[in-house]
From Swiss-Prot:
It catalyses: heme b + 3 reduced [NADPH--hemoprotein reductase] + 3 O2 = biliverdin IXalpha + CO + Fe(2+) + 3 oxidized [NADPH--hemoprotein reductase] + 3 H2O + H(+). Residues 76-98 are annotated as: Disordered. One of its GO terms (cellular component) is cytoplasm. Its EC number is 1.14.14.18. The record marks 74 as: Transition state stabilizer. Residues 78-98 have a biased composition (Basic and acidic residues). This is Heme-degrading monooxygenase. Homodimer. InterPro entries: ABM_dom (IPR007138), Dimeric_a/b-barrel (IPR011008), Heme-degrading_MO (IPR050404), IsdG (IPR023953). One of its GO terms (molecular function) is heme oxygenase (decyclizing) activity.
Length: 121
């Protein structure tokens, strides 16, 4: 199992806009239905951090995959390219990058999982 994170550093106050993009709340955001139908996709979460001692916020996009190949197939798909503005003519024209300072992508192989023990009463 593979976990991919995209940690997006944004100016204070810009996180809600980024979150709306990934949840589709803008009406033109991340196609959550499309990713949910990708073979090998296991889950998607958004995390939001507001460090009090920093002048920025972070939105961490996490996705869980059966394999590296499954995740790479998503990145190569037309749905991914459309959602991320990677069409021939739109890459530099995207206004929805406002407030984004930078980002870092990391890949992790899951080496251990501990699930809760369910005790029947």
């Amino acid at each position: 199992m593979i976990i991919v994170t995209n940690t997006i550093k944004v100016e204070k106050g810009a996180a809600e806009h980024v979150i709306r993009q990934f949840t589709g709340a803008n009406g033109d955001g991340h196609p959550t239905k499309d990713i949910a139908e990708v073979e090998g996709f296991l889950g998607f979460e958004l995390w939001h951090s507001k460090p009090e001692d920093k002048d920025y916020e972070e939105v961490v996009v996490t996705s869980k995959w059966e394999s590296e190949e499954a995740q790479r197939n998503w990145v190569k798909s037309d749905s991914f390219k459309k959602a991320h503005g990677r069409t021939k003519d739109t890459r530099e024209q995207r206004e929805d990058r406002k407030g984004i300072v930078g980002n870092a992508i990391a890949r992790f192989e899951v080496v251990h999982v501990q699930n809760p023990v369910i005790v029947e009463k």
